[in-house]
């Protein structure tokens, strides 16, 4: 039918946080260090290697479902089980916890190029095991240099994932002029 839209391969990458992390690492996108694990024991080893605090993530959910910030080893098993429950995958992601401010970035991609970018402040409600966005504020107030770095990182992510002919929505951490 030759309809335009996101390529299947890009959708596969962008709907699995571990595959996305692999693609981003290969594409030079700034991201938290992390490891794919298949057991609570592997999660424990990954957390020790990365250093606490870490984030244990379900790889195939959105809305922060299946995501737990882990401060010490006594929390790993429960965090691993929380991430595995409800997942179609046999692995989860353990990442180094990033400090900074979480913002949202929306945009449009045409011919593999980010043609519109709208970084914004996010307002969220945080429950026990989920985060729900309740509002956004546009434009995001930042320096020109930071806006350029956000755009650069987003273009790297678009290129690394193969996203094309689509809208994009990303959660980005900002600390000073650093973007993840």
Whereabouts are the PLM-identified features?
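Active-site nucleotide/adenylate-binding loops and adjacent lid/helix of ATP-dependent enzymes
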Residues: 13-93, 99, 110-111, 140-152, ...
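Phosphate-binding core of ATP-grasp and ATP-grasp-like enzymes
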Residues: 83-91, 98-140, 148-180
């Amino acid at each position: 039918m030759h309809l335009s839209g996101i390529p299947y391969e890009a959708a596969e990458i962008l709907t699995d946080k571990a595959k996305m992390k692999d693609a981003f690492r290969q594409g030079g996108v700034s991201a938290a260090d992390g490891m794919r694990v298949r057991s609570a024991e592997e999660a424990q080893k990954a957390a020790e290697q990365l250093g606490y605090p870490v984030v244990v993530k379900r790889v195939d959910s959105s809305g922060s479902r299946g995501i737990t910030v882990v401060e010490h080893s006594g929390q790993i098993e429960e965090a691993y089980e929380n991430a595995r429950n409800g997942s179609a995958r046999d692995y989860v992601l353990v990442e180094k916890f990033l400090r900074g401010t979480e913002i949202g970035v929306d945009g449009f991609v045409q011919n593999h190029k980010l043609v519109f970018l709208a970084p914004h402040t996010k307002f969220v409600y945080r429950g026990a095991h989920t985060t729900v966005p309740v509002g956004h504020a546009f434009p995001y107030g930042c320096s020109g240099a930071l806006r350029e770095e956000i755009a650069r990182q987003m273009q790297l992510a678009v290129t690394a994932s193969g996203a094309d002919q689509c809208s994009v929505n990303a959660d980005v951490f900002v600390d000073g002029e650093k973007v993840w």
